[in-house]
Amino acid sequence: MDFAERLAEVLYDAWGMKVAGSFAAAGGLVFNAGVFAAPHEEADYQEGKYSFYYCERASRGAPLFQTTIRRVFDHCVLQNYGNSLRIRYGFPKLTLGDSASIRSGWTMVHTGSSLRHDYLGIRSGDGNFYPCETCDFRLLAGLSHVVEYSPLDVLECYLCPDAGPLLSQWLSKPAR
């Protein structure tokens, strides 16, 4: 089973959310709980770019994130649903993508616009660039810690109570 199939299975199990469509031939996906006119998410693949949108009242706003690399896209989609899945299954939240800082030695690449805090992606300490156009710095910070792993492996860690072995360092600590 690949990442997309497993994620669809997990989303259906958790909330009855159906994932319909495909990226074949510039297609798209719809993430929907089956409630007509309810807010939902959509993803599409157009002109070499994967984009993820939040939709409300039958309208789709600007993309929450865009990338030309499917693996990066899969990780970003997982960051979008990861903590909600953990809460649904009664597991503690992870601080990854919430309050985690960008990985040491990595940088966020800005668009260069002084009017907005938009990013083009992240760059690793050894110079590898992972494109991800977004204004969500928390998404990029979390991405820096997981992008070198398989999205399927990271998904399975989100589904473990201890988040191990890859994500356990980001388990929320109980307040003292």
Give the location of each predicted region.
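Surface-exposed beta-loop interaction hotspot
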Residues: 68-118, 122-125
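Intrinsically disordered, low-complexity, charge-dense segments enriched in Lys/Arg
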Residues: 103-176
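A short, compositionally biased
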Residues: 25, 45-50, 113-118
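N-terminal "first-domain core" detector
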Residues: 1-44
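Short amphipathic beta-strand/extended segments with alternating polar/hydrophobic composition
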Residues: 39-45, 62-69, 123-138
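Short aromatic-glycine-(Arg/Gly/Cys) micro-motifs in beta-strand/loop hairpins
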Residues: 34-62, 176
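Acidic, aromatic-enriched beta-alpha/helix-loop junctions
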Residues: 57-71, 145-149
